[in-house]
Amino acid sequence: TTKNYGNGVCNSVNWCQCGNVWASCNLATGCAAWLCKLA
Protein backbone atom coordinates (compact mmCIF):
# COMPACT_ATOMS: atom_id res chain seq x y z
CA THR A 1 0.00 0.00 0.00
CA THR A 2 1.02 3.64 -0.29
CA LYS A 3 0.31 6.63 1.88
CA ASN A 4 0.10 10.02 0.19
CA TYR A 5 1.52 12.98 2.06
CA GLY A 6 1.75 16.23 0.15
CA ASN A 7 3.68 15.47 -3.03
CA GLY A 8 5.29 12.40 -1.53
CA VAL A 9 4.24 8.79 -1.49
CA CYS A 10 5.49 6.37 1.12
CA ASN A 11 5.67 2.89 -0.37
CA SER A 12 5.67 -0.58 1.14
CA VAL A 13 9.47 -0.64 1.47
CA ASN A 14 9.53 2.58 3.49
CA TRP A 15 10.76 4.97 0.84
CA CYS A 16 9.07 8.13 -0.32
CA GLN A 17 9.64 10.20 -3.42
CA CYS A 18 9.02 13.93 -3.37
CA GLY A 19 9.82 15.24 -6.82
CA ASN A 20 13.26 13.84 -7.62
CA VAL A 21 14.19 13.39 -3.97
CA TRP A 22 13.96 10.02 -2.24
CA ALA A 23 14.01 9.57 1.50
CA SER A 24 13.20 6.94 4.07
CA CYS A 25 9.74 7.19 5.55
CA ASN A 26 7.23 5.56 7.80
CA LEU A 27 3.93 4.14 6.61
CA ALA A 28 2.20 5.51 9.69
CA THR A 29 3.27 9.11 9.11
CA GLY A 30 4.14 9.28 5.42
CA CYS A 31 6.81 11.55 4.02
CA ALA A 32 8.16 14.48 5.97
CA ALA A 33 6.16 17.57 5.10
CA TRP A 34 9.28 19.71 4.81
CA LEU A 35 10.81 17.32 2.28
CA CYS A 36 7.74 17.39 0.08
CA LYS A 37 7.52 21.16 0.23
CA LEU A 38 11.19 21.66 -0.66
CA ALA A 39 11.13 19.21 -3.55
Curated annotation (Swiss-Prot):
Signal peptide: none annotated. This is Bacteriocin E50-52. GO terms for cellular component: extracellular region. It is found in: Secreted. Keywords: Antibiotic, Antimicrobial, Bacteriocin, Secreted. Belongs to the bacteriocin class IIA/YGNGV family. GO terms for biological process: defense response to bacterium; killing of cells of another organism. It comes from Enterococcus faecium (Streptococcus faecium). Bacteriocin active against the Gram-negative bacteria C.jejuni, Y.enterocolitica and Y.pseudotuberculosis, and the Gram-positive bacteria S.aureus, S.epidermidis, L.monocytogenes and Listeria spp. When added to the drinking water of chickens, causes a decrease in the levels of C.jejuni and S.enteritidis in the ceca, and in the levels of S.enteritidis in the liver and spleen.
